[in-house]
C-alpha cells in the first residue's frame, strides 16, 4: 500500500462545508498519529494528507482544551471498534451493502479488505466529497470495494432519493455507520435521521453509531473542550443517557459499549472503566444495533 504521509502539508479544506464537517479533519489527524505507532490498531496511509495542517491544529487544540490526549485516543478506539463491526457484518454475515452516513474523510473503502462484490456508499455534503475526491485523486489511491459517493445534505428530507439513485437496494441486507455526527445535531434532527435509516433498511440490517450522554453537558471539567468546539462553530447539542431507548423508538435493538470496556479498549483508553450505574459523569457510547 502506498504511503501518502509525505503529503501532510496539503490542505483538503472543503470550501463551503460547515464546521461539523470540518471535525472530520481532527479525526483524520488522530488516525494519522495512530498509524505511525509500531503497535497501531490500523494503518491509514491517507489520514495525514486528508487531515492537512488544519486537522492537526484541531487535534492539538482539542487536547489542550481537554487537558489530556483523550480527544486523540477516543477517535482511535472508535475507528477500530467500527472497523471490526463493519468487517464482521460483511465477512461473517455476508452483507454486501455498506452505507457511511456523514462519511467525512473516512478511508475505510481504501484501507480495509472487503469481500468481493461489496458496495460502499459514502454520503456527505457536496463540498466535503469534492475536496476529498481531489485529495484522493492526487494520492492515486484505489478503493478495495465498489465505492459510490452520494453528495447530499443529510438534513435535507430528500437525501434517501439520492442514495436510491446510486443503486442502493433497501430490500437487501445492509450495514450502516453514523460516526461522529449525532452529538452535533438537534434532537429533532437525530430522530428524523434515525427514522429515515429505519425506512431504508431491511429487517436484520445493522447500524453502528456513537453517542454522548447528557452528563457531558453538566460536567464542569468537560466545559473547556465544549467551549473550544463552540468557538470553531461545532457546538455539542445532543446527548442521551439511554441509547437503547433511543434506538428502540426507531425499530432497532441496541448493544451499547463504553470505551474502556472489553472490546472497546485496545490498550488505548487511559482511564479506569466506570459502570453506567454511577451517575454524574460524562460518557460516550459505541452502539451496534439491529433492525428488529
Regions found by a protein language model. Give the residues of each.
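A short, conserved alpha-helix within the catalytic core of class I
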Residues: 147, 157-161, 184-199
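Short alpha-helix
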Residues: 234-259
Amino acid at each position: 500500500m502506498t504511503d501518502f504521509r509525505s503529503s501532510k502539508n496539503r490542505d483538503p479544506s472543503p470550501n463551503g462545508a460547515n464546521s461539523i464537517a470540518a471535525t472530520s479533519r481532527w479525526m483524520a489527524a488522530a488516525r494519522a498519529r495512530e498509524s505511525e505507532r509500531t503497535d497501531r490498531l490500523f494503518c491509514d496511509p491517507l489520514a495525514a494528507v486528508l487531515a492537512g495542517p488544519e486537522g492537526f491544529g484541531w487535534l492539538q487544540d482539542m487536547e489542550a482544551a481537554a487537558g489530556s490526549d483523550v480527544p486523540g485516543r477516543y477517535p482511535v478506539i472508535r475507528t477500530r471498534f467500527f472497523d471490526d463491526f463493519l468487517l464482521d457484518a460483511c465477512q461473517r454475515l455476508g452483507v454486501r451493502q455498506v452505507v457511511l452516513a456523514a462519511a467525512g474523510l473516512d478511508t475505510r473503502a481504501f484501507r480495509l479488505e472487503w469481500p468481493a462484490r461489496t458496495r460502499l456508499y459514502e454520503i456527505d455534503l457536496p463540498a466535503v466529497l469534492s475536496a476529498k475526491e481531489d485529495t484522493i485523486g492526487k494520492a492515486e489511491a484505489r478503493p478495495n470495494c465498489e465505492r459510490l459517493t452520494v453528495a447530499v445534505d443529510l438534513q435535507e428530507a430528500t437525501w434517501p432519493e439520492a442514495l436510491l439513485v446510486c443503486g442502493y437496494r433497501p430490500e437487501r441486507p445492509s450495514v450502516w455507520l453514523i460516526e461522529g455526527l449525532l452529538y452535533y445535531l438537534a434532537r429533532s434532527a437525530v430522530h428524523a435521521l434515525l427514522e429515515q435509516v429505519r425506512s431504508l433498511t431491511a429487517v436484520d440490517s445493522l447500524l453502528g453509531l456513537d453517542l454522548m450522554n447528557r452528563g457531558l453537558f453538566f460536567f464542569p471539567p468537560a466545559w473547556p473542550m465544549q467551549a473550544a468546539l463552540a468557538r470553531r462553530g461545532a457546538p455539542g447539542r445532543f446527548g442521551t443517557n439511554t441509547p437503547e431507548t433511543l434506538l428502540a423508538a426507531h425499530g432497532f435493538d441496541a448493544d451499547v459499549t463504553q470505551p474502556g470496556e472489553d472490546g472497546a479498549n485496545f490498550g488505548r483508553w487511559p482511564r479506569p472503566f466506570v459502570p453506567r450505574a454511577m451517575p454524574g459523569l460524562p460518557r460516550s457510547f459505541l452502539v451496534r444495533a439491529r433492525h428488529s
